[in-house]
Amino acid sequence: MTQSSDPAQAAAANATSTTKPYAARPDAIDWQRADDSGTRSATFNGTRDAGQTFTYAFHIPAGFWDRPHSHSGAARIFVATGELRIGYGNELEPSEALSYPAGSYLYVPAGAVHFDGADVDTTIYGVSTGPWSTDYT
C-alpha cells in the first residue's frame, strides 16, 4: 500500500487496484474527466475492460439533463449526494422522471433506455462490469 500522510493521496494512489484499500468522500473525489456541461466522472477502482468489475463516481450539476441513452452493462447505483432524477424511454421527459435522494439505490439493467438529470448538484457512485459503453438513441 502507498505510504502517505495524506489519506486522500494514499487512496488516489490505490484507486485502480482491486487488491488495495480505497476510500473516497464526495467532497474529495479525484475527478478524471470533466465535460463542458459540468458533468464529471472518476473511476475509483478496477477497469472498464471486458469482464472486469469497476466502481465509479459521476457528478451531475443542477439543471443538467442527459438525453435518452443505454449502457452496455448493468449499473448498480448509489446516490451519494443530492437527488438523482431518472426516467425510462426514448423521449426526454423530465416531468416523467422519478426522484431518488441521497442514500437511494437503483439498478439499471444493461440496454435499458433511460434519461437522467438533477435539480440540485448530485453525485452518484456506481458498480458495473465491462466492457462499458454509452449508446445514445
Model-derived segments and their meaning:
Residues 35-39, 66, 113-116, 135:
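Membrane-topology and secretion signals of cell-surface/extracellular proteins
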Residues 47-49, 84, 90-111:
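Short acidic-glycine-tyrosine-enriched beta hairpin
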Residues 61-64, 71-91:
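Glycine- and acidic-residue-biased ligand/ion/polar-headgroup-sensing regions
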Residues 66-68, 86-87, 108, 113-119:
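Short beta-strand His + acidic residue motifs that chelate non-heme Fe in jelly-roll/DSBH
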Residues 55, 65-67, 74, 95, ...:
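A structural connector/turn signal
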Residues 3-54, 97:
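A short, N-terminal "cap"/entry segment at the start of jelly-roll beta-barrel domains
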